[in-house]
């Protein structure tokens, strides 16, 4: 991409994190104020942009540039995305996101949450 969307509309909150949450993982709410990894193309609430000492900084809105994805159906435009583990996938029951860039060689995409 020849333009930068870094910083666009970012909104980050700090929540407790389950042990399997890593930086870059799409996450879902798993309890009161706690996030964990998604399973089976579940809708995610945000992306973990920082993880430390049992807490995660979760980006809930804005541009995220290097989201790993798997499967087909991830393309530029509005796409419903769910997640399985640390990867996004096109999913009917997913969250509508604006996909602004797709790198098929690296299997990553840039999205606006």
Segments (PLM) and residue ranges:
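Surface-exposed, low-hydrophobicity beta-strand/loop segments enriched in small/polar/acidic residues
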Residues: 1-113
């Amino acid at each position: 991409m020849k333009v930068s969307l870094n910083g666009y509309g970012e909104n980050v909150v700090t929540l407790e994190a389950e042990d399997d949450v890593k930086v870059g993982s799409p996450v879902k709410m798993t309890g009161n104020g706690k996030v964990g990894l998604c399973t089976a193309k579940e809708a995610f609430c945000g992306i973990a942009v920082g993880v430390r000492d049992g807490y995660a900084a979760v980006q809930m809105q804005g541009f995220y540039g290097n989201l790993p994805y798997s499967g087909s159906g991830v393309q530029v435009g509005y796409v419903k995305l769910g997640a399985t583990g640390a990867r996004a996938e096109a999913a009917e029951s997913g969250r509508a996101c604006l996909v602004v860039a797709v790198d098929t060689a690296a299997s990553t995409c840039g999205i606006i949450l």
